[in-house]
Structures are given as C-alpha cells and as structure tokens.
Regions:
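Non-catalytic structural scaffold of enzyme domains
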Residues: 1-161
C-alpha cells in the first residue's frame, strides 16, 4: 500500500483533500501533518521565513521517517519552503499548484494568477515563471488578488469562498 503524507497549513482543505485522494487513489494510505501557524506566519510577514523553512524541512523529514511514498504540499503560500524542504528528503514531493503552473505555461504566454490569499501571489507567480524557464518559454505573469477572500473562507466556508 502506498502512503501519501499531506502537509497542511490549515484545516480548511483537510477533509476535501483526504476525500479526493481516497477517490483517485483508493489503495493509498493518507496521513496528515497540520501546522496552522505556517499560514499565519507567512501571511504576517508577506513571505516565507527561516522558521517556516525549518519547520517544513522537519515535517518532510518526519514524513519520510514514517514511510511516505509521496509528500504532498497543500499550500501555495509555503511552496517555496516546500521546494527547499524537498531537497532534504529522498521522497518525491508534489506541490498543490505545480501541475497548474505547468499546464498554464503549456497553454499560453500571458498567464493570469488569481489568488485568494495575499501570501500566495508571489510564490505562485514565481512557480509559473520557474516552470516557463524550465520549458524554455517566455511568459508574462499577471497577478490578481481577490482581497478579503481568505477572511470569507475562514468565516463562512468553502462554498461562499
């Protein structure tokens, strides 16, 4: 049985991701590491901090220690920390927005990045640029923040968000 360890920065998507993994890979064992201080810290600072990187490295090392076959990083805001942490383990790491960035780069040169969390804008734009560079493509990345959407998500839930 394959084991997937999901590293979360909030409880918001925990149930939905667990359900999706169970539907897509029913034979997989899903384990979760949840640290809601990560999103709060990156939001307060506007970028990842050395403390975030340190904790992400420890979480990835813990995931590897419990036998993960895949580590899934649930949050775009800490995606750059996940990329650093991925270099500390031998387990494959998948970022939640990685496939989206690759697909966007394959589809066009002007790419809009719509984010509902302010701390996600820069890392998501950087990921798209990185994927474009790897693919040998020139792209223009246009960021857009839906201001207040995170507050709606936390107060009113996913449907309203």
């Amino acid at each position: 049985m394959k084991k997937i360890v999901v590293v979360h920065t909030s409880l918001v998507s925990h149930e939905e991701l667990t359900r999706l993994f169970s539907e897509i890979i029913p034979e997989a064992e899903i384990r979760n590491i949840i640290d809601d201080s990560l999103l709060a810290e990156v939001s307060a600072n506007g970028h990842i901090t050395p403390g975030i990187v340190s904790r992400m490295c420890k979480y990835f090392e813990n995931a590897q220690a419990i036998g993960a076959d895949l580590i899934f990083n649930q949050c775009s805001s800490v995606g750059e920390a996940a990329a650093i942490a991925a270099r500390t383990v031998s387990v494959p790491v998948l970022r939640i927005d990685e496939a989206m960035a690759e697909e966007a780069v394959s589809l066009g040169q002007r790419i809009g990045v719509v984010a509902t969390v302010g701390s996600t804008v820069e890392p998501s734009c950087n990921l798209v640029r990185s994927k474009a560079l790897s693919a040998g493509r020139n792209v223009e990345v246009i960021p857009y923040l839906v201001d207040g959407a995170l507050d709606v998500l936390m107060r009113e839930g996913r449907e309203r968000h």
